Amino acid sequence: LGANKLVDITKNLDPANMQNLGGGKLVDIAKTLPPDAMKDLGGAKLVDMTKTMDPTNIAALGSDKAADIAKNLNDDNFKDLGGNKVATMAKVMGGDTLKEIGSEKAKGMAKAMEKDDIQTLASDQIVGLASGIDSKQITDLGSDKLVTMVDKIDVDDVKSLGTDSLSSMMSGVQGTQIADLKDDKKVSIVDNLGANFFNADKASLD
């Protein structure tokens, strides 16, 4: 049929049509569309498609195709999709892919998720998402989400965040929240924080 024709047809499906088609059929359509055709379809239509899919359908998309969808969504699209579905996409994409989708998209996904949604992610998925967000912007997520992410990351994975991401996340977490973290997590955080976090940079030559 060709990608262009498939885009034309899909653009003319409303949510009720999609519901009638079913998630499995929409997965087949999504898998057939190359990245540029996804872009042509537009974020709002991709949201309608993804909303119609259940977790099994989204898993059937595979990591790369789920990422293709995410790359064509903006903050409003992610919000419209809802935290539960965004978390499902994040799980299918996995940590490595989340890290590569671009800061704006990773941040959009994190903003759309509530704390409960973040808690359903695995440690490596949170590391990928967090380290994929520009370290200067990650504090925009707010202290509650940041501490939820830090809490869910395994002690052994803290190092994988990198000092910039870890420092920025911790600067956005409140002191009272740090107190509630497990002791081994606190030790790992201090162990992996960069010198900048401890203001050692003020003693530098510049």
Where are these regions (language model features)?
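General marker for long, soluble alpha-helical cores
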Residues: 1-206
